[in-house]
């Protein structure tokens, strides 16, 4: 923030959650103006992110292991649909010791349009051999929730950086505080 003198860092970063690199670039120019040194900023933040990823690892959401373990034990098909490139997602899941829980991983490069469009979730369902109507999806971002809803899945929101606004409350089948609560909810409805 200091080096780039960002006008509204929090607002800008929140607006970028769950979007593609292209949409992030558009958002940053909208917040910071056309002279913003986007490529330099992206390189600096990417280097810092990878440094943290290598030295500290990425945090695993509360209840992730419990939910994924229960899903596998229950015989559920488990997929992941991310705007991030699949090779990055696979690397991160491997480092976190979670890769073995996923039957299908769909990265941003595998869908014609990214979130908030439904394409990425429709592709994941197709690869899993299931209908969207029979699937539950868990999201923490606004664009992810819009994507889940548009694809016809049962959208569950577990807020992280973004608190659920009125739109998210209307899109979500349910809003839960963590993934342990998601597991408990699914035990009752699935």
Kindly give the residue locations of the regions a language model identified.
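Short beta->alpha linker loops
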Residues: 16-20, 44, 59-63, 84, ...
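Helix-loop "lid/cap" segments that line or gate small-molecule binding pockets
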Residues: 1, 20-35, 92, 124-125
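Active-site neighborhood of HAD-like aspartate-dependent phosphohydrolases
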Residues: 1-14
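Asp-based, Mg2+/Mn2+-dependent phosphohydrolase catalytic module
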Residues: 69-70, 85-190
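Short, flexible loop segments at the rims of nucleotide/cofactor-binding pockets, characterized by
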Residues: 54-59, 83, 152-155
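Metal-dependent phosphoesterase signature
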Residues: 7-8, 28-66, 74
């Amino acid at each position: 923030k200091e080096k780039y003198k960002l006008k509204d860092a929090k607002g800008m970063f929140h607006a970028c959650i769950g979007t593609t690199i292209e949409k992030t670039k558009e958002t940053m120019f909208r917040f910071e103006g056309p002279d913003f040194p986007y490529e330099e900023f992206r390189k600096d933040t990417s280097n810092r992110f990878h440094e943290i990823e290598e030295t500290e690892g990425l945090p695993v959401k509360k209840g992730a292991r419990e939910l994924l373990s229960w899903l596998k034990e229950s015989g559920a098909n488990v997929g992941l649909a991310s705007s991030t490139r699949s090779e990055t997602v696979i690397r991160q899941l491997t480092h976190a010791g979670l890769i073995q829980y996923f039957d299908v991983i769909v990265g941003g490069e595998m869908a014609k349009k990214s979130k908030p469009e439904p394409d990425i979730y429709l592709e994941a369902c197709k690869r899993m051999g299931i209908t969207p109507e029979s699937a539950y999806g868990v999201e923490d971002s606004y664009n992810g929730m819009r994507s889940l809803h548009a694809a016809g899945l049962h959208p569950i929101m577990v807020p992280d950086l973004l608190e659920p606004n009125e739109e998210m409350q209307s899109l979500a089948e349910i809003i839960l505080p963590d993934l342990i609560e998601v597991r408990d909810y699914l035990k009752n409805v699935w």
